[in-house]
Regions:
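Interhelical loop and adjacent transmembrane-helix boundary motif
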Residues: 72-73, 228-276
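Transmembrane alpha-helices
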Residues: 94, 172, 194-231
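Generic hydrophobic transmembrane alpha-helix motif, especially the helices
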Residues: 126-164
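Transmembrane-helix boundary motif in ABC transporter permease subunits
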Residues: 93-125, 138, 146, 286-292
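C-terminal transmembrane helix and the adjacent membrane-cytosol boundary/short C-terminal tail
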Residues: 108, 112, 173, 177, ...
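Transmembrane alpha-helical segments of polytopic membrane transport and secretion proteins
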Residues: 1-40, 286-296
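Amphipathic cytosolic juxtamembrane alpha-helices at the membrane-cytosol interface
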Residues: 113-117, 122, 180, 184-212
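Periplasmic/extracellular loop-to-transmembrane helix junction in inner-membrane transport proteins
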Residues: 13-36, 50-95, 255-266
Length: 296
């Protein structure tokens, strides 16, 4: 009997060792594959960043920010009008898109909750989040540009705002949902009106998360080109008239990069570097703001 028990114990131990060996082998294979996949993705990301930096740094100068885009096959010049135009488009898109996104997010998190209207809004919002920017551009072209019979800065603002609003809605709703219901109940117990509770408690508690969403939304629209081709188009001259086509960095980069002129191509690479650095800084700032609130 003792011999049988010893043999059984030895067999179980051997089976356990084999099972553990198989698990370790599977773990090594999975770890190796995941590391290889990560390295593959990082390689292309680093390669793109290095190519952008090495090609764009040569075109960086003070003239880039002070001079207008040059005529074809002309030395010198800069991207001042394109930078100013992009700044105006992003500014106005944020001014219009952010309040709409925040108010819609407040409705979904505080008022609508599981109502049919809230579900419809969430469904439409999910569609807009995943919609290609060129589809948004064509939509705005149809309802704005075609009706006005000319391109304009305001058409570009509307298109960019339509891309920005869904991100702000989703972020605002999610951040408000993270606020404990006990805080809401405590405010109601003190006789606080709902609007005041939202303004003084839930919004205040989630302001850093909402700011993070706004910054990410700005980063999202900063480099959009396709929709601006159908709305704001571009302008070779300095113009702040939003009723007319307005210069912007993404379309200028597209036009210059596709040209046969070396001077324009150099300016295009410099513009790409500017957009890359701006988006990188916005993402870093968003993470810092969110981390500060999380650990604070």
């Amino acid at each position: 009997m003792a011999m049988v028990e010893m043999q059984t114990t030895a067999a179980l131990a051997e089976s356990r060792r084999k099972m553990q060996a198989r698990r370790r082998l599977k773990n090594r294979i999975a770890l190796t594959l995941s590391m290889a996949t990560m390295a593959f993705g990082l390689f292309w990301l680093i390669w793109i960043l290095m190519s952008t930096i090495t090609r764009g740094i040569d075109g960086m100068s003070l003239a880039l920010f002070t001079e207008m885009t040059p005529p074809p096959n002309t030395e010198g010049g800069g991207l001042a009008n394109a930078l100013a135009g992009s700044g105006l488009l992003i500014l106005w898109a944020t001014v219009f898109g952010t309040p709409l996104g925040i108010m819609a997010g407040i409705y979904l998190a505080e008022y609508g909750r599981k109502s049919w209207l809230a579900e419809v809004i969430r469904f439409i919002n999910d569609i807009l989040l995943s919609a290609p920017s060129i589809v948004v551009g064509l939509f705005v072209y149809t309802i704005v540009v075609a009706q006005m019979e000319h391109f304009s800065g305001w058409a570009g603002v509307i298109a960019l705002a339509l891309l920005q609003v869904p991100i702000v809605i989703r972020t605002t709703e999610n951040m408000l949902k993270l606020v404990p219901d006990s805080l809401r109940e405590a405010a109601y117990a003190l006789g606080t009106p709902k609007w005041k509770m939202i303004a003084a408690i839930t919004l205040k508690a989630s302001v850093s998360g909402i700011m993070t969403g706004i910054l990410l939304a700005i980063a999202r629209i900063a480099g959009e080109t396709a929709l601006l081709l159908f709305t704001a188009l571009s302008n070779q001259f300095w113009s702040t008239d939003m009723m007319q086509p307005i210069a912007n960095l993404p379309v200028t980069i597209f036009k210059f990069a596709m040209s046969p002129f070396a001077e324009w191509q150099q300016l295009a690479w410099a513009g790409v570097l500017i957009i890359t650095l701006c988006v990188l800084l916005l993402n870093i700032l968003a993470r810092v703001v969110f981390a500060k609130n999380k650990h604070g």
